[in-house]
């Protein structure tokens, strides 16, 4: 079989075609810490095998976010928060996308709980209670119960490569109007609507067990949220100084001429039209925080 990565539509995905590698043991350089990774692939309808990549609906996002190390504040990667419902709730397509991700989650959990996988991981007592946070879809909860009417969110990471201390973002970003590539870092904290192709990459097994979901490609429609000017301002008239040449002809020199003027092709931030974000969403939910603190002394 040849390696052939294809986009698998949610309606066409068959979880029985999801393939898992044997656990690979890896270690973090210069530390005694090791972990296991189970790579995920997919058998396409033509029999070829490639990465498992599914498309999202057109979703609202708060833009590219930096992931930082809590101790050093160093940037360790990037992610995109995706709001999975529109302002009116969930459309049929959005519900189907959520159901597709959760069917993949369930298939991965079933694989982890097989005797052969537990033996390979040397986690013989692993059970479903150890996988409570395995689902990457975040839902706001109050006293342990899901808050009704709040959109679930997904926080997929960008695909990056690290070499010699440098980090490069490999995820593709494309402008929906022009079709031109966009620099990912120009989208930091920029509100936008976007359609992504998500790579269901692997299962990470370390201190925690999590499903690794990455953004393979992202088509972006930026939302203009700046203020617009309401008062008209008359431009100053251009004064022309008449200079007599040796031939008796007159030349005009425009004062204040700026060769670098863009003729309004690029708007200043103050001149941007105010556009209501579409869809309107609740403020970005906080990511689940780890409980901590000092223990009470007896």
What are the residue ranges of the model-derived segments?
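OB-fold ssDNA-binding interfaces and closely related basic DNA-contact patches used
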Residues: 2-164
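Hydrophobic transmembrane signal anchors and adjacent membrane-proximal interface regions, especially
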Residues: 5-7, 35-40, 99, 126, ...
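Compositionally biased, intrinsically disordered low-complexity regions
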Residues: 49-52, 65, 79, 146, ...
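Extended serine/threonine-enriched, polar tracts that run as long, contiguous segments within proteins
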Residues: 139-223
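Long, highly charged low-complexity segments enriched in Glu/Asp and Lys/Arg with interspersed Ser/Thr
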Residues: 206-256
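Extended acidic low-complexity intrinsically disordered regions
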Residues: 232-235, 249, 261, 290-298
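Acidic, Ser/Thr-interspersed intrinsically disordered low-complexity regions
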Residues: 240-281
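Acidic, serine/threonine-rich low-complexity intrinsically disordered regions
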Residues: 276-291, 298
